[in-house]
Amino acid sequence: MSEASGTFNWDDRSGKSDYANYGNRGERYLACVAYLGGKEERPSAVMCRGYYTFAYLWAVDFDGEKLKTRWLHSSNKKTTYQVMDAEGKQTTYTPAACSSGMGRNTMYANGNHNLSVGDVDGDGCDEIIWGSAALDHDGKMLYAVGFGHGDAIHLGDMNPDRPGLELFDVHEEKGEFAWDLHDAATGEILWKGGQEGADNGRGLAADIVAGSRGYEFWSSYGGFDKASRNQNPFNAVTGKEVGTRKPSMNFRIYWDGDVQDELLDGTSITKCTSSSTTDLGIHATSTSKKTFASLGMSPSSCNGTKATPCLQADLFGDWREEVIWWNTSNPSQLYIVSSTTDTKYRVPTLMHDHLYRMGVAWQNCAYNQPPHLGYYLPDHADSFQGVKDDATAIADLPQRNEILSRTYYNLQGQHIATPTNATQVYIVKERHADGTVTTKKFLRR
């Protein structure tokens, strides 16, 4: 084992005049792990300070003996920023204008109470998703959306019919728009809305409606009407309202064995569709079903009204996720709760998916958020050959009319180039002239 040693001075600004430390704004911290040099290198730790105004992100590597700076990003203004490299050389940059036109073109004032990590631009290296802005793997700006500070962030393949990943972000700025959904690689705004002038403190994106392709998204001030409040789910592909219920706005979770998300809030797990919500019997206080109390257990979520788990992740590898809560009767004890519901699908361990694994690493940061997969599970479940009565076969699905494009994936759902290995098993998604999408699994011999 090697012991890390070494300290580095922070830029310790204070004072109300520049707002850096006013109202504790200079003492807001985030952290994550990111493969900034590619997935074949060691990951870097990225330590972050400030997101209401000034924003500093320090990427540091450990070589087995010492901590070494990879880069230090400083966004002290809305229109310029600095990056210090590993040799201590600092360069000032002027980025492109933000996609919202709000004038916040850097990380300055664009940060959330949370962050995300993933290779959103497909270059093999991770980017840092800040909320209304994103940082490239080299510490330079990838883009800025510019809607400002937010409370919730969700990164995933929300629209499986367009390339890349999407980001759903809710905004606390009380501005013209309370939320937006944008391209995670470019910052292009795909949808935006919500009640004008609202402090939108809650929001979630998840695939909860089986008959509606893609994710749904909803928030405390959702919808597209600036004058009225709407908390119903909307579809990320079409932008249309797809439900009359108000789902919980906390964590998504794979629990009951189908390929849609369930919802976790506090110590309750529910199944939500476009028109109904079903309690799955995982809760602490309900009198109508078996409770933890009846089993002599007293679990609790964390973070007060945020009601988040100690951790949610696919710990045991069957692709359904476990939840960790703490024992209110004995805080030194933890409960690990796992689904006992059967499933017909066999899906690769979620921790093999890079986006999901990075999400588990940053999950306990500030306002905790759930991890998401880097692929759209309903498109891949059959390709994983997870159906029990045909669990190992490699078979082609029927081909439909003219093929317009092909996209290749490995068994973890990650994009790959055209397969060349002699015995590689891979998945191909084909888009057809009639608008349909088929998925096939191949073994190259």
Where do the protein language model's features map onto the residues?
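Beta-propeller-forming repeat regions
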Residues: M1-A391
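C-terminal outer-membrane/trafficking sorting elements
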Residues: A391-R445
